[in-house]
Design a protein with these regions (language model features):
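A short, conserved alpha-helix in the catalytic core of glycosyltransferases
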Residues: 168-172, 179-199, 203
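Glycine-rich, basic loop-to-helix element that forms the pyrophosphate-binding segment
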Residues: 76-92
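Conserved donor NDP-sugar-binding/catalytic core segment of glycosyltransferases
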Residues: 108-138
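Short beta-strand/loop segment that forms part of the nucleotide-sugar
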Residues: 47-57, 74
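A conserved acidic beta->alpha catalytic loop
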Residues: 55-63, 104
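Short, well-formed alpha-helical segments that are part of the catalytic scaffolds
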Residues: 6-7, 27-42
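Cell-envelope/extracellular polymer assembly enzymes that use nucleotide-activated donors
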Residues: 17-19, 50, 186
């Protein structure tokens, strides 16, 4: 059973076609480029969209940067990625949702492809394969190639970029707030199952990958990351532990 604070959606606004939701905690270094890239992508879409940045209790200028860039800022005080994403979805005023990480560049062609699919009546949601903004260590590169294969084969979206029908998102309960990481995997499965009943596909796009930050692969060794992922694959209930998921919540001291 999904545990979520997602209880209602803001009533859709007729002239807002899609919503891009960005969860952000202390992302003043990456958010400007992410928003600049997003604005560029949105210019290529004829329909009107909105940007929602969820300030997840930041202590830096994340919220100010978002407002200056024209985004709506939603405050979520509880530090949890799933809850931040749900808060953004709850505030969204459209029928199409796009979730984008604050350290990720969205290619214009990818946004167009995702929205076109959602509007086609054949797709309930999906994600994309990953590229990174800098070369990765050898083992890390192999891990990402393996993940991209798993993503395509099993139709599992990475959290960096997820798109879906708002009705599918709300019908399946949104992101599970019992977990502190991996919530995108569980959501992918639930929306895919929901879509199957509606004759709608959950698809992983490959032609225009997002470009996301490689910072974690430089903060931690590839072996550390590989062992952590192995732990979660064997013991998925460990994703309910904030301590065990600290990889996603702590950063090295500057």
């Amino acid at each position: 059973m999904v545990h979520s604070t997602l209880k209602r959606q803001t009533a859709p606004v007729r002239d807002i076609y899609y919503s891009v939701i960005i969860p952000a905690y202390n992302e003043e270094a990456f958010l400007p480029d992410t928003l600049a890239g997003l604005h560029l992508a949105m210019k290529a879409i004829p329909q009107k969209g909105e940007i929602i940045v969820v300030d997840n209790d930041s202590t830096d200028s994340t919220a100010e940067i978002a407002r200056k860039a024209g985004a709506r800022v939603v405050f979520e005080p509880f530090r949890q990625i799933a809850r931040a994403r749900n808060s953004g979805a709850r505030a969204a005023r459209s029928a199409l949702l796009v979730f984008l990480d604050a350290d990720t560049i969205l290619p214009p062609a990818l946004l167009n492809q995702a929205l076109t699919l959602l509007a086609s009546g054949t797709c309930c949601g999906g994600g994309t394969v990953l590229n990174f903004d800098a070369p990765l260590p050898f083992l890390a590169g192999r891990l990402i190639k393996f993940w991209n294969w798993i993503s395509r084969t099993n139709r599992l979206a990475a959290g960096s970029f997820i798109f879906c029908l708002a009705r599918a998102f709300h019908a399946t309960g949104g992101f599970d707030e019992k977990t502190f990481a991996g919530e995108e995997i569980f959501l992918s499965r639930r929306i895919s199952a929901w879509g199957k009943k509606q004759n709608l596909l959950f698809t992983i796009l490959e032609k225009h990958p997002v470009i996301t930050s490689s910072r974690k692969f430089h903060w931690y060794s590839s072996l550390q990351i590989a062992l952590l992922l192995l732990l979660f694959s064997i013991f998925p209930f460990a994703l309910r532990s904030r301590l065990l998921c600290r990889f996603w919540y702590t950063r090295p001291m500057k």
